[in-house]
Amino acid sequence: PDGLDFTNYDTTMSGEPHRWGDYEIGEKIDHVDGVTIEEAEHMMATRLWQNTAKVHFDATHRDDGQRLIYGGHVISVARTLSFNGLANAQMIVGLNGGAHANPCFSGDTVRAWSEVLDKADTSAPGVGALRLRLVAYKGDAVFQLNRNDPKRPNWRYA
């Protein structure tokens, strides 16, 4: 947007000191926290998104009797989790795609990590862009974390 200027942005307001210049292409960020998916929040969110697929609402539509959690809800949870590690990100400029690789059910705990794919400088003062790959998962982390990263001494790693 015209007039965008983050030159004097105060990182103490977000509680995280890292800005665009601190991230490196290829870096993987563990977003640390997890969220256990609840039936009620899934049902409400799925209705708000106007997804009417019966597998999300009617337990009799699956042989195991479980409602399948709507992938859009999992994506939203992952995006929320990504604020831990990307707290100074100010806007999403685009979503380039998504895949639902595995099922999610009520009671599953979702975690997330991101990989920095690319960086771009912009003409706006104090503003840069990161191209990220955000991955939601349940279970153990799917990559080895650098637990001794001097840039992030206060991060807890799962």
Where are these regions (language model features)?
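Generic structural hydrophobic/aromatic packing signal, biased to beta-strands
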Residues: 20, 31-34, 45, 78, ...
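Hydrophobic beta-strand-centered segment that forms part of the acyl-chain substrate-binding groove
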Residues: 63, 69, 74-119
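Short, intrinsically disordered/low-complexity patches at protein termini
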Residues: 53-55, 93, 98-99, 129, ...
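Solvent-exposed loop and beta-edge segments used for protein-protein assembly and interaction
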Residues: 25-26, 69, 106, 126
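Catalytic strand-loop segment that frames the active site of acyl-thioester-processing enzymes
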Residues: 1-68
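HotDog/MaoC-like acyl-thioester-processing domains
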Residues: 1-8, 106, 113-158
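A generic structural signal for short, non-catalytic loop/turn and secondary-structure boundary residues
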Residues: 24, 88, 154-156
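Intrinsically disordered, low-complexity boundary segments flanking structured domains
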Residues: 17-18, 23, 80, 143-151
